[in-house]
Amino acid sequence: MIGKEETDQIMEVLKSGNISTFVASRGENFLGGKKIKEFEEKFSIKTGTKYAIAFNSATAALHAAVVAVGVQPGEEVVVPPYTFTSTATSSLMHNAIPVFSDVKRDIFCIDPSKLENVYSKLTRAIIPVHLFGHASDMDEIMAFAKKNNLRVIEDCAQSPGGQYKNKNLGTIGDCGVFSFQESKNVMTGEGGMLVTNDEDIANAAQMVRNHGEMIVSNKKRTYKSEILGWNYRMTELEAALGIAQISKLDFLNEERIKLADFMAKEINKIDGLRHVKYDYVKHVYYAFVFSFDEVKIGISRNVFCEALAAEGIPCSGGYVKPLYLNPLYLEKRAFAYRHYSGNVKYEKGICPISEILHEKEVILLEICRYPATLEDMQDIIDAIHKIIENKEELTKKSN
């Protein structure tokens, strides 16, 4: 949703000539320019956190988070396998080891009851993912983390504005990371944000973002790199887009929720289809996702999705292959594994729920968002009924 607000913000930056005012030297611009600071301030107010640090991607912000919470190379970070790749590779980028723990079959988020199975003396952090906009079970996750002295990084890439028991997602763990990639609820083209109430985490994240140096405004630059850092800096143009977009977050989320509520009500009337949302969660629907039972429906998920696409409704089955089934993990290609003293295993079968979700059950609809209407949602429901009513014919065609 791009309008006059975004255009005005972008033109202001272009006319100023300050496209990126980050510098790695003493002065206020070590922390970015005018638009960066304004975007960070607005986002910290929106989430209710003390600190918000803008990055050029959520991947970069996740990497910075792993560093900032104190994970050391060779230590382990527990992540779900049913998520975008960056949740896991952010650990490998720091030469730490991702350990995969299975998800819940109903909400697709990491299952707290499985955490004990993967915990080891090397475990240092957990990254729960609020997948598709639905919150993970944060009470149980935080209790496990507290018992074992672990840090918690919330992956909120798909859940800006979401809540768990009236708490903003990203504010429950030690820090939270958001994405502003073009497909997200609000976007800057590319971009990310780390939020936290911990000053030490904020300072470390700022160092990772800007070449590993910490520049104090009242001291001379020492050119001393305290930690390994990168150029993970957001531009003024992206921040300007973010300023305009963040003011629209509530409206855009409300539109998604309105459409998804209608879809959920209708989907759950059909035996063999199911959408789950916990009552104490504010789901912000990066995508509308439901489970498919091919035995009850009478056709395979692939046939169903192909038929839905033939009706003009884009959908996808499975989301992502569980990450550990990719060659990066199966063959332990990353440098981190060469100096790792643990015994993590990556092989088919270690997270069976994630595998069955990918192979048979999950269907995604990514069109339940503004400017779609309730009439559009009814068209989807009508198409689903049409497919089920004609499943015998579809079965013949697929054989």
Locations of the language-model features?
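Conserved PLP-binding active-site segment in aminotransferase class I/II-type PLP enzymes
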Residues: 1-68, 72, 94, 146, ...
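Generic structural signal for small/hydrophobic residues in well-ordered secondary structure
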Residues: 10, 43, 61, 77, ...
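Basic phosphate/pyrophosphate-binding loop/patch that engages nucleotide-derived ligands
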Residues: 142-151, 193-211, 299, 303-313
